[in-house]
Amino acid sequence: MCDGEIGDPVTQPRSEGGGLVTMDQETRTHYLDAATDKHLTNGSPDPEPVDPLLVAQWSIENVTSWATCMEHFSRTLLDCLRQEAIDGEVLLSLTEEDVRDMRYKLGYKLTFGELKKFWIAVLKLQLLVKNSSAESVILGIECHGNGNSVYMPLASTGCGPPSSSTCPCPQAECPSYVSDCDTYLRMGGRYVPPEYFKTAMSLGYSFVVTWITSLTMVIVHERVPDMKRYPPLPDIFLDNVPHIPWAFNMCEITGSLLFTIWVVVLTFHKYRLVLLRRFFALAGTVFLLRCVTMLITSLSVPGTHLQCSQKDFAIDDPNVDMVGALIIRMSRAYRIWSGLGMSIQGVRTCGDYMFSGHTVALTLLNFFITEYTPRNLYFLHTLTWLLNMFGIFFILAAHEHYSIDVFVAFYITSRLFLYYHTLANNRALMQSDSKRTRVWFPMFSYFESSVDGMVPNEYDTLGSLIDGIIEQIFKAKDQLAISVKRCWLDAPLSGNSSAHMFGGESEQCLRNGTASAAFFSPHQSLIGGLGGQRSQTHLNSAQSGSSTPTPATSAPTKSLPTQKKTFRDASVDPFSRTTFAAVQQAENVKDSPMKEKKHL
């Protein structure tokens, strides 16, 4: 229905000539005293009729009077209308969310029932004006048919009376900053900016975490328990499944296939930067947690086929100092980092058991592919889940991890993914207590601050993708040219540079003992702002009267360093005290010939 969650639609009588339209008695809500049968607000049982042609021209007092006559509203609500400057035009463009914000964002102490009654009154007034012949009034009236807030101008629409099943409200026009108008309208007026800087920040965060993980794997390999003293722990799955030598390589091939699918999804998805930002943030967080669990507890080697020993990575050379040991560990960490920790890349590590990094990678790729592909791609979703499960099975069949390692990795990764996207897709959960969200989830609050709701799964064609790449290249070139021009041609002059530019000329004038107009010419615009054309005349007069002898009492004399400092300060700061002193001195110099003549 057309009026959303408020109630049944209300159809008002329409005037052919745009005259007065009086609301029906059934649609009017009164608060009557049983004893006196009078209206509790103004003592009149019938409010004045409303002219829909004049509602948009109401002043703040007219709106307050209308609210007083319509319902028994509290003084707090009336004060809110006055303080927030709600006039007729603003009243007609109010939405249910705006009315709700009076209590939850603006902080007015209004009851829930009063807010609902005020919104019902506003909605009735909006429908009354919309159904009248006031076609020359541009209004922002909300269509509540599909749950999306779509605002449209009434003059160009002529949206008819609301019905119980349909709401013939037209679509709004896109703002100028939206490049994809169809996506903007399908998202209900929401726009998802790419935010390159935030994506770069998430990439940097993930990059740092991968280096920390590699260094942690080097350290835990040095602390791996001795296989002779600490045999493999009892495990239900490992004790009943024989060792398959090629299984771990198959697990990594499975992960590579999932990664290839994810790269294809990223390439053609319209909001690829949002997906990248979320992937890097979640992957970095999970692997950072894995560094803690690997380091605090060292489990014994899960299989006897693994050749793991502390001597392989131990640094026992007494000639190696702390810096040398750090360099050796960093070189080993680089080998792990460059090989992505994969055995098919020649990387062999021990001790990094709790929890499984391969399971984390498989689960993250599976969940991201499933989330950001259309729901009707059942074959793709089934394939990714099969690859995920078979990858986990291959890890256990290779006896490279305990069962608890795989289970904890799958649980933590899946829960973190679901919690993150639950908060991101439901904006109200994050905005209900924004301060606490920023404290407990600072990275989430930063990365998702401009994303409102679910990201639609929309894809670019190959042609549009190429056009977008070319457009981004030209846009980057234009931005670079503008930045170079701004830095090279439009660089503002600092105080030191201006003093350096005009300092030589001022020193020349001071050595000549005259305050010539040429000295002041670079600063006429500065001093002219203080005295206009008058100050320029004074300076020129000072030049013409410089040859006339001036009595000692006509103008105060200053030493050469004082004058030099005064003019330097005037060039740097035209509003300093020394600038006014220089102007006053010039006026005294101008008046000195008249005083001398009078003295003679």
UniProtKB/Swiss-Prot annotation:
Task: Name the keywords, alphabetized.
Answer: Endoplasmic reticulum, Lipid metabolism, Membrane, Phosphoprotein, Sphingolipid metabolism, Transferase, Transmembrane, Transmembrane helix
Topology term for the membrane: Multi-pass membrane protein
Q: Which GO terms describe its molecular function?
A: ceramide cholinephosphotransferase activity; sphingomyelin synthase activity
List every stretch annotated Disordered: 1-21, 530-572
Q: Which residues carry this modification: Phosphothreonine?
A: T514, T548
* Record: active site: H358, H401, D405
SAM domain residues are: 58-129
One Pfam family it belongs to: PAP2_C
Pathway assignment reads: Sphingolipid metabolism
Task: Tell whether Cell membrane is among the UniProt keywords.
Answer: no
> What ranges does the Cytoplasmic topological domain annotation cover?
425-600
Q: Which residues carry this modification: Phosphoserine?
A: S525
The UniProt entry's GO biological process terms, in alphabetical order, are: ceramide biosynthetic process; regulation of ceramide biosynthetic process; sphingomyelin biosynthetic process
Q: State its location(s).
A: Endoplasmic reticulum membrane
Q: What is its main location?
A: endoplasmic reticulum
Q: According to its record, what are the GO cellular component terms?
A: endoplasmic reticulum membrane; Golgi membrane; membrane; plasma membrane
Q: What does this protein do?
A: A phosphatidylethanolamine (PE)/ceramide ethanolamine phosphotransferase that catalyzes the synthesis of ceramide phosphoethanolamines (CPE), a class of lipids that is a sphingomyelin analog and a major membrane constituent in Drosophila. Transfers the head group from PE (1,2-diacyl-sn-glycero-3-phosphoethanolamine) on to different ceramides such as N-acylsphinganine (dihydroceramide) and N-acyl-(4R)-hydroxysphinganine (phytoceramide) to form N-acyl-sphinganine-1-phosphoethanolamine and N-acyl-(4R)-hydroxysphinganine-1-phosphoethanolamine, respectively.
Family note: Belongs to the sphingomyelin synthase family.
Q: Mind telling me what this protein is named?
A: Ceramide phosphoethanolamine synthase
Organism classification: Eukaryota, Metazoa, Ecdysozoa, Arthropoda, Hexapoda
Gene name of the encoded protein: SMSr
